[in-house]
């Protein structure tokens, strides 16, 4: 039996923008302007480049299985806000990922809170790989502005 990698463990939305996520907080699909429209995002991977006191660099993929990680995911009561808590056991780093869609805006917002619970001094740089769905008509695109990535569809 094959594993269904597109199983939604959580869904957030506002009636126009709908986002499906897995249990680790990875975005599986994003729909706009209706929940049954084609998905706008093909894949998004978030990683953190970490430098420690010994100048060794490491990569921690937040939604990956590279390190032994405990996950806990829950909605903030009576909201469309989803919090995914991640604790990387052998690195003593905790990450809170917050996803939400404002009720009157056509956007998905994601925020990270990172806490170093070890005695080592570390420097963290976020990294993002993002792919958008497109076709021969090139109707989807993206741009970076003020520490944010914006995906958009020309025809909507």
Placement of each model-derived feature along the sequence:
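Terminal accessory carbohydrate-recognition/targeting modules of carbohydrate-active enzymes
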Residues: 1-156
């Amino acid at each position: 039996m094959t594993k269904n990698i597109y199983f939604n463990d959580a869904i957030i939305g506002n009636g126009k923008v709908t986002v499906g996520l897995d249990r680790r907080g990875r975005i599986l699909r994003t729909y706009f302007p209706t929940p049954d429209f084609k998905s706008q995002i093909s894949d998004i991977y978030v990683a953190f480049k970490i430098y420690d006191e010994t100048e060794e660099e490491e990569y921690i993929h937040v939604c990956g299985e590279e390190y032994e990680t405990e996950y806990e995911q829950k909605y903030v009561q009576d909201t469309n806000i989803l919090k995914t808590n991640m604790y990387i056991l052998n690195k003593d780093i905790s990450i809170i990922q917050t996803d939400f869609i404002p009720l009157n805006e056509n956007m998905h917002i994601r925020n990270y809170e990172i806490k170093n619970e070890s005695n080592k001094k570390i420097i963290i740089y976020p990294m993002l790989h993002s792919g958008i769905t497109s076709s021969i008509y090139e109707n989807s695109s993206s741009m970076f502005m003020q520490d944010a990535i914006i995906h958009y569809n020309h025809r909507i």
